[in-house]
From Swiss-Prot:
Record organism: Francisella tularensis subsp. holarctica (strain LVS)
Organism domain of life: Bacteria
UniProt family annotation: Belongs to the YqgF nuclease family.
Location within or outside the cell: Cytoplasm
Protein name stated in the entry: Putative pre-16S rRNA nuclease
Function: Could be a nuclease involved in processing of the 5'-end of pre-16S rRNA.
UniProt KW keywords: Cytoplasm, Hydrolase, Nuclease, Ribosome biogenesis
Source taxonomy: Bacteria, Pseudomonadati, Pseudomonadota, Gammaproteobacteria, Thiotrichales
InterPro entries the record matches: RNaseH-like_sf, YqgF, YqgF/RNaseH-like_dom, YqgF/RNaseH-like_dom_sf
Length: 136
């Protein structure tokens, strides 16, 4: 069965978004949605969810390097609950440790001339999704 997925790299200022498919286990950055103190632009996120129509939404859970919760972990969990209620999709939380570092490394590897926050956040969502797909 074809399974479309969306991954979200939650942040207080921006939310990175990636799409993927379980059949190919590939992820593609979509872009970012602006957030204001952790509250996303729901209209933009609604459009993305409607367009991609994912069966599942994977959200990166910000934990520290020893898997302890951080200041933003509770906000990410609250966001995940709201996403589940709003879109009525399965929501999975996955440790996003090092996803931003991995995204920056990938951009440097391809010698991206402009390592913007938008690229990093969307690519971090790809890393989150690829990690989840490899584990499921």
């Amino acid at each position: 069965m074809f399974q479309s997925l969306i991954a979200i790299d939650y942040g207080k200022a921006r939310i990175g978004i990636a799409s993927g498919q379980m059949i190919t286990k590939t992820a593609t950055p979509i872009g970012t949605v602006e957030a204001y103190d952790g509250v996303p632009n729901w209209i933009e996120l609604d459009k993305i969810i409607k367009r991609w129509n994912p069966s599942d939404i994977i959200i990166g859970l910000p934990l520290d390097t020893q898997n302890f919760e951080t200041d933003i972990t509770k906000s990410a969990k609250d966001f995940a609950k709201e996403v589940q209620q709003r879109y009525q999709r399965k929501v999975h939380l996955i440790n996003e440790a090092y996803s931003t570092r991995e995204a920056r490394w990938r951009l440097e590897e391809v010698k991206s001339k402009k390592v913007s926050h938008i690229k990093v956040d969307a690519l971090a969502a790809c890393v989150i999704l690829e990690t989840w797909m490899s584990e499921n």
